[in-house]
Amino acid sequence: MAQACKTTYSSRLKTGNTCLIQKNVAVSTRSHSSYTGRNSLRNVPAVNYAAFEQGEDFETPVETPEKEEEKFETDDRGLAVGRPTGNNIYPRFATKTRHIYVTDEQLKCAAEERDVYIPIRLDIELPNNYRLKDTFLWNMNEQVMTPDVFAQILCADLDLSTNVYGTQISSSIRAQIEEYAPVAEVPMPKGQEMLVVFNIQVQLAQLSYNDQVEWNLTSPLTPEEFSVLTCNDLGLSGESRPEIAYAIHECLLKLKKNACEGDLPDYDSDAVPGTKAGPRQDMDTLGALWQPVLETVSLEDAKKNENNRENLVKQWRREASKFGGFAADVSAERWRAAALGNLSQSETANLPSASVSDAQTLLEQERPRWRCRWCNVLGTGTFCVRRGPEGNKSLCNACGVAYAKTGQLPYWRKSLYT
């Protein structure tokens, strides 16, 4: 199939029609009309009294032509509508995407691993006062795609420097995986009902979405399915779906950590036995708090809301990274390894644990030089390293987990990234 030689995708993203790349909004902290005190007199220019003696009573102001700012028509979400002007669109030669090509057998073996999804948020400062903001899910047990390859593909699509922004994107993904992994890897018991209540607050351009949700931590319902139904009911665009799903994933991970520590809140019920009761039973306001609310805010308020939420997310990530005490049962893993690999008890005793709590991290100066002894992936392509047959810190996360579970290195990953 023929493909175009040029593309305008990267420049069209900067026109304001999407939430992926947006202009930075300067948030004013004080009013210009307020009195600034005595120090403000230092900025007053000196008066030349000699000009008054020569008869120049008034200075003639010099008018400098101001450059007209381009005005875009925006919708109720604050996004530009209509066809972008030709001055902002410029074509460039399309580059071939460097994918990692694997065989069907390798894909089949990779699909056997359990998927553990972690919410990832990117917030990267770009040139010309632009900002890259994106949210997506990353499989902690991903077997083929690495943060480095993902960053290279994203930079190629957005026409960004891989050396500058590729490193920032990959390091941001690895850091968030390291912080969420201890909580995300803990499996929840099936068949039990664990109801929790949490609030959602998402900033969608100039729209502020607020909602209160009751969720079952053991439910097979995914946040993605919930976000699709919510956006369809409220008439929101497709860009709002990953934002809402990301916010739900964050809340669920936080509540999952509280559930593992036995700190889930109890909901009081003063109802008569046999009558309807629950956190959503409200006869006074008829459940007004349980309905989604959309509000249009200014750009300054939207920026403040995003900053406040980002601070809360950073605080929660620090708490999640300190989560411990719920590592996988090492004896059970050794028993499973003996059953799968037909190993003796003495051989399985030397196997490491597959839990994230037993993994190790590399220093930033070690990552560019480190490579996995089996699949040959770089240290920047894995969020943690593990012990293997050749010693400590010799395997990446994917190879190390397979070795800990089966006692054998995965044959299909041999020299995968050579």
From Swiss-Prot:
Example of a GO biological process term: transcription initiation-coupled chromatin remodeling
Protein keywords: Chromatin regulator, Cytoplasm, Nucleus, Phosphoprotein, Transcription, Transcription regulation
Keyword NADP: no
MF terms (GO), sorted A to Z: sequence-specific DNA binding; transcription coregulator activity; zinc ion binding
Superkingdom, natural source: Eukaryota
Matching Gene3D superfamilies: Erythroid Transcription Factor GATA-1, subunit A
Principal place of residence: nucleus
Gene Ontology cellular-component annotations: chromatin; cytosol; nuclear chromosome; nucleus; RSC-type complex
Location of this chain's protein in the cell: Nucleus; Cytoplasm
Phosphoserine modification, residue list: S269
Ranges of compositional bias, category Basic and acidic residues: 64-78
Positions of region (Disordered): 57-81
Similarity annotation: Belongs to the SNF5 family.
Purpose: Component of the chromatin structure remodeling complex (RSC), which is involved in transcription regulation and nucleosome positioning. Controls particularly membrane and organelle development genes.
Quaternary organization: Component of the RSC complex composed of at least arp9, arp42, rsc1, rsc4, rsc7, rsc9, rsc58, sfh1, snf21, ssr1, ssr2, ssr3 and ssr4. The complex interacts with histone and histone variant components of centromeric chromatin. Interacts with sad1.
Name under which the protein is recorded: Chromatin structure-remodeling complex subunit sfh1
Source organism: Schizosaccharomyces pombe (strain 972 / ATCC 24843) (Fission yeast)
Lineage: Eukaryota, Fungi, Dikarya, Ascomycota, Taphrinomycotina
